[in-house]
């Protein structure tokens, strides 16, 4: 019986801080495409990075404004800000500040950052101030995340003047591969996989590959012990226990800090207050995005609750 072939050569053909190309050979026929596709999909969708998610410019109410004494309009300034690359560590969110009150070019290096935030491309252009009487002052919210997130899925900010942005968190700019035939002994129908990727400089190519492989292996390992169990329905919670949970703080909900902050901004402090709100009422609040709403509904479901409940009816059913 023919032995299964495993790779004998795995090496980087070229690698620097932004670009890398490596080779894996030989592989059984079809495995080049299988491995290449898996790596590419995980790299583009699941590697964490940092991005600007909202900006507040002093004196500006919306993104279609202009700023007297500044060459660019707000839309162009936002587009330029999106080109600034950040490395955010030990935190999921930070607010950065920029203030410039002299004529000249405004660069990413003018942004004030805490110790856990590094600007990768400090020479990135943001705007030009043309007037000595103009001050460009802004707050910039950056967050960690993965993939591409639309602005309506972001945590909304109730305070006036903030513009919430679409965010491309992925540090991977290009991920591509090709599969060629390679020889093992007399056979020439084995695969040679050549994979290349370009990052934005926040992560190196080898680190990105390592993270992607670890994610794939972790998922595959979970499939080594497949068992089928008929799901059992949870025992219904006693009414008095349900009523007690209604008095709990929303801090008890298994939701992200982002979703928790969104609820606090609209004045919700207890689970009882939350369950009396309908889904439409939460949707109509600019503080609650689609992602936060999904988290809230799932957390309530796990506790035996749902949105739009009539607590009065619940109490009367106990009597």
UniProtKB/Swiss-Prot annotation:
Key word Hydrolase present: no
GO biological process, one term: DNA-templated transcription
SUPFAM superfamilies attached to this UniProt entry: C-terminal domain of RNA polymerase alpha subunit, Insert subdomain of RNA polymerase alpha subunit, RBP11-like subunits of RNA polymerase
Enzyme class: transferase
Catalytic activity: RNA(n) + a ribonucleoside 5'-triphosphate = RNA(n+1) + diphosphate
Transmembrane segment boundaries: none
InterPro entries in the record: DNA-dir_RNA_pol_insert (IPR011262), DNA-dir_RNA_pol_RpoA/D/Rpb3 (IPR011263), DNA-dir_RpoA (IPR011773), RBP11-like (IPR036603), RNAP_asu_C (IPR011260), RNApol_insert_sf (IPR036643)
Disulfide bridge positions per record: none
EC id: 2.7.7.6
Chain segments carrying region Alpha N-terminal domain (alpha-NTD): 1-227
One Pfam family it belongs to: RNA_pol_A_CTD
Annotated GO CC locations: cytoplasm; DNA-directed RNA polymerase complex
Example of a GO MF term: DNA binding
Region span, Alpha C-terminal domain (alpha-CTD): 242-319
Keywords: DNA-directed RNA polymerase, Nucleotidyltransferase, Transcription, Transferase
Protein family (similarity comment): Belongs to the RNA polymerase alpha chain family.
Role played: DNA-dependent RNA polymerase catalyzes the transcription of DNA into RNA using the four ribonucleoside triphosphates as substrates.
NCBIfam families linked to this entry: PRK05182.1-2, PRK05182.2-5, rpoA
Domain notes: The N-terminal domain is essential for RNAP assembly and basal transcription, whereas the C-terminal domain is involved in interaction with transcriptional regulators and with upstream promoter elements.
Subunit structure: Homodimer. The RNAP catalytic core consists of 2 alpha, 1 beta, 1 beta' and 1 omega subunit. When a sigma factor is associated with the core the holoenzyme is formed, which can initiate transcription.
The protein's name in its UniProt record: DNA-directed RNA polymerase subunit alpha
């Amino acid at each position: 019986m023919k032995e299964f072939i495993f790779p004998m050569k795995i090496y980087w053909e070229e690698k620097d801080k932004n670009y890398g190309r490596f080779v894996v050979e030989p592989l059984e026929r079809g495995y080049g495409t299988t491995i290449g596709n898996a790596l590419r999909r995980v790299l583009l969708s699941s590697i964490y990075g940092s991005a600007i998610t909202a900006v507040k410019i002093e004196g500006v109410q919306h993104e279609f404004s202009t700023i007297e004494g500044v060459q660019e309009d707000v839309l162009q300034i936002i587009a330029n800000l999106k080109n600034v690359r950040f490395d955010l560590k030990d935190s999921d969110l930070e607010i950065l500040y920029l203030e410039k009150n002299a004529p000249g070019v405004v660069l990413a290096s003018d942004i004030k950052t805490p110790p856990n935030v590094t600007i990768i491309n400090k020479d990135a252009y943001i705007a030009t101030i043309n007037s000595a009487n103009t001050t460009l002052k802004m707050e910039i919210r950056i967050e960690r995340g993965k993939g591409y997130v639309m602005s309506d899925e972001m945590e909304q900010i109730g305070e006036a003047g903030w513009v919430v942005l679409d965010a491309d968190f992925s540090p991977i700019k290009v991920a591509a591969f090709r599969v060629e035939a390679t020889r093992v002994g007399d056979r020439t129908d084995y695969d040679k996989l050549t994979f290349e990727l370009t990052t934005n400089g926040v992560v190196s190519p080898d680190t990105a590959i390592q993270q992607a492989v670890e994610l794939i292996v972790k998922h595959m390992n979970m499939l080594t012990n497949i068992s089928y169990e008929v799901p059992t329905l949870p025992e219904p919670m006693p009414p008095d226990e349900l009523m007690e949970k209604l008095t709990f703080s929303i801090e008890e909900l298994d939701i992200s800090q982002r979703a928790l902050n969104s609820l606090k901004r609209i004045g919700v402090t207890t689970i009882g207050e939350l369950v009396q709100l309908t889904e439409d009422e939460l949707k109509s609040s600019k503080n609650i995005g689609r992602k936060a709403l999904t988290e809230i509904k799932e957390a309530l479901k796990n506790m035996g609750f749902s949105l739009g409940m009539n607590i009065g009816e619940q109490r009367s059913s106990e009597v």
